[in-house]
């Protein structure tokens, strides 16, 4: 820690406190102090393993992890620092981002996700707050792999409930099979939010979250999701909703954009488009 000075608290994240600090050359970094739930046991070996993988990730759309400081009962992760996140940007852009901006950010997000999925790393907690943006319009994914290293928490350490808005229906219904489609669902939710200027599924509980999804995309059945009945929290008595036309809840997106979004937000995880396939979608071939 002696390398860094001028610590300034800039946030309270899902896994601990985030500080901005400088090194002796005056460069800025983001320091994440990870709180450990079972402090007497020290740092879980899974966390150490995952973080060593994160250090190997090198991509222009992923926040770089420079250093890991292993103190007694805590871990300090030293990341590159960016001033802005996508949530703040959406909040100040009333009615959604300009289409060319949304398209640029979506493509950068998919490029970063595709790279990680190729390296068998899942994010598992994608949301606009975890997407950082610099003044050049570059988007970088933060907190990659931390959800896997420390477990997806039901609550933040500050007792604030972690947002469910970007969580896939398969996870909400108790699926333990974490694979790449859970990140793609989150990307779809973020895409819709960039376009609409507000969250697509702002649920307040697991059940409310599912109902909001079903009311828009329709209730899953054996035709559109053959394995849905196997999920632990699937209820055969779920209310039956028909899917709404996309243009009724997505504004300002052309047909190719809606086609891409619909492929990301498939109820059945096995039917969701991959990040690599999404990058090749005609939506990115058009000029906005």
Swiss-Prot record:
Keyword Transferase: yes
Enzyme class per UniProt: transferase
Disulfide bonds: none
One GO term describing the cellular component: cytoplasm
List of residues that carry Phosphotyrosine: 15
Domain Protein kinase: 4-284
Binding site for ATP: 10-18, 32
Cofactor: Mg(2+)
Keyword terms of this UniProt record: ATP-binding, Cell cycle, Cell division, Cytoplasm, Kinase, Magnesium, Metal-binding, Mitosis, Nucleotide-binding, Phosphoprotein, Serine/threonine-protein kinase, Transferase
PROSITE patterns attached to this UniProt entry: PROTEIN_KINASE_ATP (PS00107), PROTEIN_KINASE_DOM (PS50011), PROTEIN_KINASE_ST (PS00108)
Residues bearing PTM Phosphothreonine: 14, 158
Activity regulation summary: Phosphorylation at Thr-14 or Tyr-15 inactivates the enzyme, while phosphorylation at Thr-158 activates it.
A Gene Ontology biological process term: cell division
Domain of life: Eukaryota
Reaction(s) catalysed (UniProt annotation): L-seryl-[protein] + ATP = O-phospho-L-seryl-[protein] + ADP + H(+); L-threonyl-[protein] + ATP = O-phospho-L-threonyl-[protein] + ADP + H(+); [DNA-directed RNA polymerase] + ATP = phospho-[DNA-directed RNA polymerase] + ADP + H(+)
A GO term for molecular function: metal ion binding
Pfam family, one: Pkinase
Subunit text: May form a complex composed of at least the catalytic subunit CRK2 and a cyclin.
Family: Belongs to the protein kinase superfamily. CMGC Ser/Thr protein kinase family. CDC2/CDKX subfamily.
The protein's role, per its UniProt record: Serine/threonine-protein kinase. Involved in the control of the cell cycle. Required for entry into S-phase and mitosis. Probable component of the kinase complex that phosphorylates the repetitive C-terminus of RNA polymerase II.
Identification of the protein by name: Cyclin-dependent kinase 2 homolog
Organism of origin: Plasmodium chabaudi chabaudi
Gene: CRK2
């Amino acid at each position: 820690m002696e390398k860094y000075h001028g610590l300034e608290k800039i946030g309270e994240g899902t896994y601990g406190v985030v500080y901005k600090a400088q090194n002796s050359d005056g460069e800025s970094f983001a320091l994440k102090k990870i709180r450990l739930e079972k402090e007497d046991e020290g740092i879980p070996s899974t966390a150490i393993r995952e973080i060593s993988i994160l250090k190997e990730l090198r991509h222009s759309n992923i926040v770089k992890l420079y250093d890991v400081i292993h103190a007694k009962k805590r871990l300090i992760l030293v990341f590159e620092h960016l001033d802005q996140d996508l949530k703040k940007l959406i909040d100040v852009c009333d009615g959604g981002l300009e289409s060319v901006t949304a398209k640029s950010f979506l493509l950068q997000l998919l490029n970063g996700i595709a790279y990680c999925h190729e390296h068998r790393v899942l994010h598992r907690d994608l949301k606009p707050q975890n997407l950082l943006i610099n003044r050049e319009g570059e988007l970088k994914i933060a907190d990659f792999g931390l959800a896997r290293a420390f477990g997806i928490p039901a609550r933040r350490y500050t007792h604030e409930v972690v947002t469910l808005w970007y969580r896939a229906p398969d996870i909400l219904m108790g699926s333990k099979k974490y694979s790449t489609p859970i990140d793609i669902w989150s990307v779809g939710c973020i895409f819709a939010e960039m376009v609409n200027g507000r969250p697509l599924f702002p649920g307040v509980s697991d059940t409310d979250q599912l109902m909001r999804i079903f009311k828009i995309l329709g209730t899953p059945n054996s035709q559109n999701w053959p394995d849905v009945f196997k999920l632990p929290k699937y209820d055969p008595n779920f209310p039956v909703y028909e899917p709404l036309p996309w243009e009724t809840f997505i504004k300002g997106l052309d047909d190719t954009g809606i086609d891409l979004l619909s492929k990301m937000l498939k109820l059945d995880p096995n039917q969701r488009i991959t990040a690599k396939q999404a990058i090749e979608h005609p939506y990115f071939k058009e000029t906005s």
